């Protein structure tokens, strides 16, 4: 469903979202190039306990792009306005990849979200690590765009799927072909992918917060096998958010909710429990 809200730019913005389950609200924020469907691997166990609100960030999925500047800041502003518009300010939040960085920013602002689980947040690179992420991701997306004609076949063939998803999943065989196909279409067609990727890699390191500033639990989760943002970046993330707890996902790439869905769902529910 689409609901109209307002961005701090005073520009009208539409944010597509789905709501599943009942109970205490839980916000899910996907990563760069993706959509709410990225969370399908853990949607069912979360919705059994919580009222899950999974959004498409502006310019991704079924949400139109923002008018004017598109950056990490304006995306954060748009999510903030969405939460206020729907009486969800202070709700618990989970983010993946770029979405993980956004929920860290919302936690830093104070009063926007409650408990937070940030899964492999982007932006804690140093020196050449930034270029590795940018070049690897940029080249991979070009390949995905070029292979769209063959993607239905690639998504259903285990060996081809494993080759395609090597940078992103340690267990591509466990992913549903329908999810893979939807994700690859999203990467190929998102109108603001290139611009947001450039802003992400050019942006200053994420602002942290002083010790003792958090009033709600914050967990930073990281896959030991993340080859886009190396595990040592998790230490920098925790240094920026010293009150956070660091959770390691063994045998996982950059998307723990893909490679370890049961562990990820359990971590989210435990962290955001009353």
Task: Give residue ranges: language-model regions.
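Conserved alpha/beta-hydrolase catalytic His-Asp/Glu region
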Residues: 151-212
């Amino acid at each position: 469903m689409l609901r109209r809200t307002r961005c701090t730019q005073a520009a009208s913005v539409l944010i597509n979202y789905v709501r599943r389950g009942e109970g205490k609200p839980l916000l899910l924020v996907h990563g760069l190039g993706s959509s709410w469907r990225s969370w399908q691997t853990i949607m069912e166990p979360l919705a059994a306990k919580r009222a899950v609100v999974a959004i498409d960030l502006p310019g991704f999925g079924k949400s139109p792009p923002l008018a004017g500047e598109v950056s990490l800041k304006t995306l954060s502003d748009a999510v903030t306005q969405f939460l206020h518009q729907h009486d969800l300010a202070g709700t618990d939040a989970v983010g993946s990849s770029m979405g993980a960085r956004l929920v860290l920013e919302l936690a830093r602002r104070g009063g926007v979200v409650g408990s937070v689980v940030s899964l492999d947040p982007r932006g804690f690179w140093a020196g050449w690590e930034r270029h590795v992420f940018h070049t690897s991701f940029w080249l991979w997306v070009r390949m995905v765009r070029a292979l769209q004609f063959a993607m239905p076949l690639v998504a259903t063939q285990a060996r081809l799927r494993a080759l395609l998803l090597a940078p992103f999943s340690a267990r591509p065989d466990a992913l549903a072909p329908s999810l893979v196909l939807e994700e690859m279409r999203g990467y190929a067609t998102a109108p603001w992918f290139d611009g947001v990727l450039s802003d992400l890699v050019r942006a200053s390191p994420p602002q942290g917060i002083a010790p003792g500033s958090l009033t709600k639990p914050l967990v930073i989760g990281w896959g030991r096998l993340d080859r886009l943002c190396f595990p040592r970046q998790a230490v920098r993330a925790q240094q920026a958010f010293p009150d956070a707890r660091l959770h390691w996902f063994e045998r996982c790439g950059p998307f723990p909710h893909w490679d370890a869905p049961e562990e990820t769902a359990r971590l989210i529910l435990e962290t955001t429990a009353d």
